[in-house]
């Protein structure tokens, strides 16, 4: 969006049908709007911070989210631990630029990139889950959506009804981040869910909920 707005500003500056003052005002407005969009990911945690307690809650190797909006940082902590890197939910909330409205996919990628070391780097996984094992893209963090409202959805909906800045600061649709561990012999998916811990989803359940977005840690060595 910032790039498109800057492009529009360039077009406006070269539009002869606009008076000089109108061109100047239009260009300034578009550039200011572009700057605002670029700063939104960084301003969200400041304007709508997540309040967390000390430490992280773990169920085995699964980090459990301590706030309705921290599923992505908790999932990131789980994926990192499975890769031999220790990081807590609170640390990843900051790295992922998580606010009380949730985490953007780019924020999740940023958090993983800042937390990895050595040959491990975050990469976007194939949009086809059936290709993950063959391509070495497991475990990974997958973004999913549920047909029925979750507890997180209800909490975020209350924020919106109170007239908050959700339309600007929060994602337009609610989702959930999970860690996909792999498939069993029956084709069921083994899931590390930051909301409840380890669980199993059927093949159809997972494919029906998966948004097509997933991130894994690739070994570049």
Where are each of the predicted segments found?
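Predominantly the structural core of cysteine protease catalytic domains
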Residues: 101-181
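Sec-exported extracytoplasmic/periplasmic mature domains
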Residues: 76, 80-85, 97, 101, ...
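Noncatalytic regulatory segments and standalone regulatory/sensor domains
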Residues: 1-29, 33-43, 150-221
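Proline-rich low-complexity regions
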Residues: 73, 137-141, 194
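Active-site-adjacent structural segments surrounding the nucleophilic cysteine of cysteine proteases
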Residues: 1-107
